[in-house]
Amino acid sequence: MAQSFGLIGLAVMGENLALNVERNGFPISVYNRSRDKTDAFISTRAKDKNVVATYSLEELVQSLERPRKILIMVKAGAPVDAVMNQLKPLLEEGDMIIDGGNSLFTDTDRRVAEMESTGLRFIGMGVSGGEEGALNGPSLMPGGTEAAYREIEPIVTKIAAQVDDGPCVTYIGPSGAGHYVKMVHNGIEYGDMQLIAEAYDLLKNVIGCSDRELHEIFSEWNTTDELNSFLIEITADIFSRIDPDTNQPLVELILDAAGQKGTGRWTIASALELGVATPTMTAAVTARIMSSYKAERVAASKILEGPSIKFDGDKKAFINMVRDALYCSKICSYAQGMALLGAASKEYNYNLNLGEMARIWKGGCIIRAGFLDKIKVAYQHDPNLANLLLAPEFKQTILDRQSAWREVIATAAKTGIPVPAFSASLDYFDSYRRASLPQNLTQAQRDYFGAHTYMRTDKEGIFHSEWTQLAKESLQISTPEVPLAHVEENEAPREVVETAPVETKS
């Protein structure tokens, strides 16, 4: 009997997805380039299950019912293309390849176009949830043609995480939409993790919380509607773990140098390309880079002294303020992520449903959190919401707690504790809420040295000033008795020298 589904790549994620597919009633064939890996899987975790081992791509293809559906779980980039190039000659019209890795969305755009032009189908599917999610139900983000998605819908809706309002999967959009949404998910994840790390740093190094106290604090936070999440849950768990070799808290023995695989950088690069501000994600990526300078930081710590101010306030009150600062910063981080998804949807014609994106992240994935339901509701009430900060509930939350947020960041500055993501989030809020920013000066500078022109607030049009000439004239009329900024009551304002420029951008 032919199998319903095929899978290539038996690392842990591949194995767990294969078991998930089989457990949900879909017979599956598996292939791995290492025969030993395949044999080990079949003889242990897949023993006595409806999982068929194959030892060549030809055998895999022949074992599947048509139209064939084959999930690739290999490293992103060239390995995906290599597997696809070997598979394509073996497939027939209507057969489908699904890439479940963290591929760059532009690669997925290319692969969808190439496959569809030959009568084959291609789905780029983001998979979030790690090893546990892959086995028990991940959040899935499939993109490609809707017709291709409908063919795998019966399978993916079964294997995805299940929450109160349905499976954590939906048709994301055309081309690379699925991998784009997964990329932004990962960017938000970077922000979440950095914000939590900064909260930990403040609690430990400003008010001296022990790991036992940190476990209790994060455990309590995880019971709240605001901060209940997978990442807060595992953070609390981490603080309870003792290293058996030293009888010390394990987290304190881990080198403070965080790695990254690149999806955070991809998110930032895309945001810059689309002109979307994502300062919290950027701060998170930069913090990981700074952490990698371990040897330099150790050397610098012996040379560069920081402030000697010690915190002498109320410890419990500060813990509550850190909680408020963390939540406000988290709202800003998600606002940036959703704004980026909205901009990409318009630019690439993805037609994303932002409320639905929040819904499918409620379960299975790394950023799953209770407050995602609030984001879903916000976009259901107003699908054209310009920014999450403007949603009534989130707006009021920040207005009510911004005093604590600012106090925490001020305390961090006074005590020499870096909080780049907290600070970037507050800067984002303050910049977004201000009707006027100092970039009028920036634009004047650009026009001064590069004739980049400017617009005015008092009349229509695009203008350029001869700034050197204006400076000379201003010097001629100034006197020692009259400051440059002072204008006599009866003095007529001087006319700005302007020319009609060519409209240019830079």
Give residue spans per PLM region.
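NAD(P)+-binding Rossmann beta1-loop-alpha1 motif at the extreme N-terminus of oxidoreductases
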Residues: 1-68, 91-94, 131-134, 487-489, ...
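Rossmann-fold dinucleotide-binding core
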Residues: 5, 80-83, 98, 104-216, ...
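Glycine/threonine-rich flexible loop motifs
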Residues: 69-86, 101
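Interdomain hinge/lid region at the active-site interface
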Residues: 179, 204, 209, 224-331, ...
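Small-residue-rich helix-loop
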Residues: 221, 225, 346-379
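C-terminal amphipathic alpha-helical interaction region
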Residues: 399, 404-486
